[in-house]
């Protein structure tokens, strides 16, 4: 059974880190010190699991202007295209909405823009940044 949860238990946070190491550090050859550089002990995550096995994740943050940010979206390669990532994004949106957030931003890799657009996010092409595999465009959605 596919389920998205707010990762508050240790096994859930371990699942989050497993996904990020596999999807980003192994998948894109990103050193862990860079992949986890802006995480803190207070970082909040959504974990999507299939019968307890971690398959997708994203980090959730609210900034000083009360805008929500969904960051570090990652899905294990063999689970991509099967709606796990979308379930995680929707769970993150629900968590942010419960906290009074009405505007959400996701900095998307250019190659993933279509995924976020299907979920109702609008790209702002004036925010293009990065290079190579990591050319990114900021997207936003009003709840």
Go through each PLM region and give its residues.
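Conserved acetyl-CoA-binding loop of GNAT-fold acetyltransferases
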Residues: 117-126
């Amino acid at each position: 059974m596919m389920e998205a949860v707010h990762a508050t238990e240790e096994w859930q946070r371990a699942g989050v880190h497993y996904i990020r190491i596999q999807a980003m550090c192994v998948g894109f050859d990103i050193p862990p010190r860079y992949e986890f550089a802006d995480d803190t002990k207070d970082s909040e995550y959504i974990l999507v699991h299939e019968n307890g096995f971690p398959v997708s994740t994203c980090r959730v943050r609210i900034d000083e202007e009360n805008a929500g940010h969904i960051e570090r979206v990652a899905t294990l390669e063999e689970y991509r295209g099967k709606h796990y990532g979308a379930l995680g994004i929707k769970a993150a949106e629900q968590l942010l909405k419960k906290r009074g957030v009405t505007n959400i931003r996701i900095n998307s890799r250019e190659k993933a823009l279509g995924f976020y657009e299907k979920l109702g996010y609008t790209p702002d092409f004036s925010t293009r940044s990065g290079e190579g595999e990591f050319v990114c465009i900021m997207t936003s959605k009003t709840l």
